[in-house]
């Protein structure tokens, strides 16, 4: 499989905030990128080709339930190629979940990215 991983500006902003707060977060996210390159549709399907992925934040020592959530969108060009957009990332202890309207707004940002 040959999937490119891209981000949108709001994801980059949230990533920067979490990376400053949790020193291990960039390495935690690099593990996620590795997982996505092997299985683009990892996580829980939440509709519109979007998936919610639970990841641990090693420096929090709380496991997946107290870790972060990443919302992805998978656009398949064919069976072997596509693009994975990283739409949102949030700390589970700071934000309970993400609404359908927020996801729709994030999907609109793909077009302008």
Predicted regions and their residues:
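Basic/aromatic recognition patch in beta-strand/loop cores that engages polyanionic ligands
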Residues: 41-87
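Arg/Lys-rich, positively charged N-terminal/basic patches that mediate binding to nucleic acids
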Residues: 1-28
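Enriched for short, Lys/Arg-rich terminal
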Residues: 68, 73-113
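Compact soluble domain cores
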Residues: 24-42
């Amino acid at each position: 499989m040959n999937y490119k991983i891209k981000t949108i500006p709001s994801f980059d902003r949230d990533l920067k905030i979490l990376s400053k707060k949790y020193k291990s977060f960039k390495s935690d996210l690099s593990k996620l990128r590795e997982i996505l390159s092997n299985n683009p549709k990892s996580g829980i399907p939440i509709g519109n080709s979007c998936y919610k992925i639970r990841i641990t934040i090693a420096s929090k020592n709380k496991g997946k339930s107290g870790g972060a959530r990443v919302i992805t969108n998978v656009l398949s060009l064919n069976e072997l190629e596509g693009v994975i957009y990283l739409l949102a990332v949030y700390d589970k202890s700071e934000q309970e979940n993400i609404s359908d309207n927020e996801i729709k707004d994030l999907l609109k940002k793909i077009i302008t990215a």
